Amino acid sequence: VKGSAAGAVGMGQFIPTSYRDFAVDGDGDERIDLFHSKADNIASIANYLARHNWRKGAPWLLVVDTEVDPLWVSKKAKRQGVELAEWQRRGVSMPGSYDPEAEFNLYAFSTEKDPEYRLAGANFYAITRYNHSLWYSRAVVEIAQGIAQGMAQGTAQP
């Protein structure tokens, strides 16, 4: 992969400023090659995510049921993270238990029927810094979860 019309280069499609700021040598050959080195690409993308506050083991995107006031969401929750405990007080419910002080943003994804609501944590935000499309970021999460599930079941190969 040489580049895109937008100027992104290499396998990871880094724009020039991201290449300058986040690309790293992942294979130890003392040079950065995002055009041919898979190790450099993986290390560079990991560096990008880490520098955008990726938190190992933190939730990415939680499926939720909600009756939250849309006006409150548009005024507060889209501009800054809201603690999970506050979401729960406002009527958001989800399976599982998570740190009540962890901050999340609420997103509604349009479907053919009703919107699907998701609480997005810090790791989802880190992905949206790599590509600002919410749909792209959601696809990354769902693919990664599928790979992880396959690895856990022994049905996926690295």
Task: Identify what each model region corresponds to.
Residues 2-115:
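Flexible, glycine-rich surface segments
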Residues 97-158:
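C-terminal functional modules
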